[in-house]
């Protein structure tokens, strides 16, 4: 999926802050990181503005959303195209964080354990 296609699909709107930006101020973010089994398909990609992407850093989407309630509301409203399994994983991690439970390892999609 081309980044321009992701931006157009998301109407050039950051899924975290809800603001519209010109394409040169946007980046593509993986909901399920590639290191955790995520892929480069449109169902795993969202549009993020530069400031939100910097604030998120290397944290998981759920860790970022847990720390930023307004971003969590925007994500839930704007990330409707994200595959349900990825949305469930984000919501499960948010629920675990809210309960103070330790995070369990995320299963890698499409990989085998050695």
Each language-model region and where it sits:
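N-terminal hydrophobic or amphipathic segments with adjacent small-residue motifs
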Residues: 5, 31-32, 51
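General helical structural elements
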Residues: 6-7, 101, 112
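Short, charged surface segments at domain edges that flank catalytic/cofactor-binding sites
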Residues: 1-16, 73-93, 97
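Glycine-rich loops and low-complexity Gly/Arg-rich segments
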Residues: 41, 51-54, 72-75
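C-terminal, charged low-complexity interaction regions
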Residues: 108-114
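Long, charge-rich boundary regions
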Residues: 50-68, 80-101
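Histidine-centered nuclease catalytic patch
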Residues: 16-47, 56-68
């Amino acid at each position: 999926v081309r980044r321009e296609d992701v931006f157009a699909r998301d109407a050039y709107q950051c899924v975290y802050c809800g603001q519209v930006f010109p394409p040169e101020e946007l980046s593509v973010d993986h909901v399920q990181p590639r290191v955790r089994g995520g892929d480069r398909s449109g169902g795993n990609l969202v549009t993020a503005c530069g400031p939100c992407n910097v604030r998120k850093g290397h944290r998981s989407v759920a860790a970022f959303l847990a720390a930023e309630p307004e971003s969590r509301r925007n994500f839930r409203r704007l990330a409707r195209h994200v595959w349900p399994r990825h949305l469930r994983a984000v919501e499960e991690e948010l629920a675990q964080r809210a309960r103070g439970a330790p995070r369990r390892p995320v299963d890698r999609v499409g990989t085998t354990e050695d």
